[in-house]
Amino acid sequence: VEEANRAIEEQVEAIMPHVERRVLENGARLFMLDVELFAHRFTFPPPGKTSGEVHDRLVRAYAGEPIVTIGYGPDFAVLRSRGVMMNIPQMVRELRDEIAGAGVSGGGHLVVGSIKFVEGMRDVVLENLIKKIGKAPI
């Protein structure tokens, strides 16, 4: 357990300076982290755990504010939310229908989920996802 906690701490320390920050149309704070470029790969913790740990720290740092964290790689995104009423399965369905050739799949719940897509469509999928999050109720 101690070794795992140390690995998580090292991973989070490595990625935090690279977290991108935005405030969305609905007032939610969006934090994005490229878990392929700025985190250790093929080791513990995996991208979902890394994104979750970063999200939990940001929720503490911005207590009471609506927060969404997206950890992404070349062909996936992991979402965590606090205070933003996202329907991730619905967003996945809409993205799949709206973006031809992106191969969007995935799902989750209202506050946690994951999305897969083809690598060449990453930027298009992420920008459309962010627009949807920006319209979600707080």
Provide a role label for each language-model segment.
Residues 3-138:
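Glycine-rich, acidic loop segments that terminate in or are immediately followed by a histidine
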